Amino acid sequence: MEEKALTPEQTQEVERQLEILKRGVVEIVPEEALREKIEKSVRTGKPLKVKLGMDPSAPDVHIGHTVVLHKLRQFQDLGHEVQMLIGDFTGRIGDPSGKSETRKQLTDEQVKANARTYVEQYGKILDMEKATLHYNSKWLSALNFEDVIKLASQMTVARMLERDDFEKRYKSGQPISIHEFFYPLMQGYDSVALESDIEIGGTDQKFNLLMGRMLQEAYGNDKQVAITMPLIEGLDGERKMSKSLNNYIGIDEAPNEIFGKAMSIPDELMVKYYELATDLSMDEVKAIAKGLEDGSVHPRDAKMKLGATLVRMYHGEKEAEEAVNYFKTVFQKRDLPTDIPEVKWDGESPVWIVDLLVTLDLLPSKGEARRMVQNGGVKLNGEKVEDVQLQVEIEDGLIVQVGKRKFKKLVR
């Protein structure tokens, strides 16, 4: 039976959704299928099922992770259903995407604890009450060996080795465990089990997303559309944002820390951060980009707005205002902040500067404390410490500063 043509209002709605959903994406595979799925959704009133798979091996969410979350929120706001797939089963293997060596497996307890952290932090962007939460152990644990052989028969070793990370490891003689080949197969099978219409991931996940599309066809399902999002560069402006590279902004960090880190984003990346990591409209983003280009907007002011926007998104309006004022006080006027945490000192005096920094939790280890002093990153009452062997006389009101944003005031 031939489908009825869309009404002018329905056609307008399809175009509206496509304009929003194409924002910031790298690739839609295939793009015409996305249009067809949205047309069907608008015609029938049935929401699309949009999947995001999570490997709960590193649960602290940073701005880089939020790129896909903002896209999911757009789908939610358009009335579609978000499928949050916790890879508790696949997490025991660990996603080998982009890895140069075999990853250690996680215990069930680690996977579950990390999954809880994900859900809590994702709720800062997504409406978790409107998202459906799934654990892939529900169906993957139920597969018998015959099912696994059937699944494995859908893919060749040659095709697996087309994956960039596997290819590099194979050519360099690095071992690849057979179980790692099952990760993309299992992730693809998740789409079969969930009957997903769309799956979203970073560009490093493209192979896995297309695996879902291929397996859905093999199992007689409608094929999902794969949408890839950019991997945002970190604060160094070169490598992708990563906690291990210490070039990240964590969404759970303190407001002043988020704001201060935003001020260190390279100028050339500001517009990308605005587009991919904030909730500002494209008209607002375009206006900022135009202002930066024609010189009517100073890069410092654009960064301050970006920092305030990020703090507002994850902490609130009041905290954003306070972070702006804190930054102006500490860095623009070169004064000390008014709310320096006070620590009652009952220890020895004098005390070795390295021990002092670790005791005050300003640095996590003596090694890092030594390096920070040697690099000129430690001040006492505004004076730079140059001697790593310095014995510090503890006096009431002594202000210890590490880097640009960490302060402690000692009271006796």
Curated annotation (Swiss-Prot):
A single GO molecular function, which one?
ATP binding
**Motif 'HIGH' region located where?**
56-65
Segments carrying motif 'KMSKS' region: 240-244
The cross-references to SUPFAM superfamilies, in alphabetical order and at most eight, read: Alpha-L RNA-binding motif, Nucleotidylyl transferase
Q: Kindly give the Pfam families that the UniProt entry links to this protein.
A: SYY_C-terminal, tRNA-synt_1b
Q: Where is the S4 RNA-binding domain?
A: 351-412
Q: What EC number(s) has UniProt assigned to this enzyme? A: 6.1.1.1
Provide the top EC class. Answer: ligase
Q: Which UniProt keywords apply?
A: Aminoacyl-tRNA synthetase, ATP-binding, Cytoplasm, Ligase, Nucleotide-binding, Protein biosynthesis, RNA-binding
Q: Where is it mostly found?
A: cytoplasm
Q: Which residues bind ATP?
A: 243
Gene Ontology BP term (one): tyrosyl-tRNA aminoacylation
Record text on subunit structure and interactions: Homodimer.
Functional description taken from the UniProt entry: Catalyzes the attachment of tyrosine to tRNA(Tyr) in a two-step reaction: tyrosine is first activated by ATP to form Tyr-AMP and then transferred to the acceptor end of tRNA(Tyr).
Q: What is this protein called?
A: Tyrosine--tRNA ligase
User: Per UniProt, what is the name of the gene that codes for the protein in this document?
Assistant: tyrS
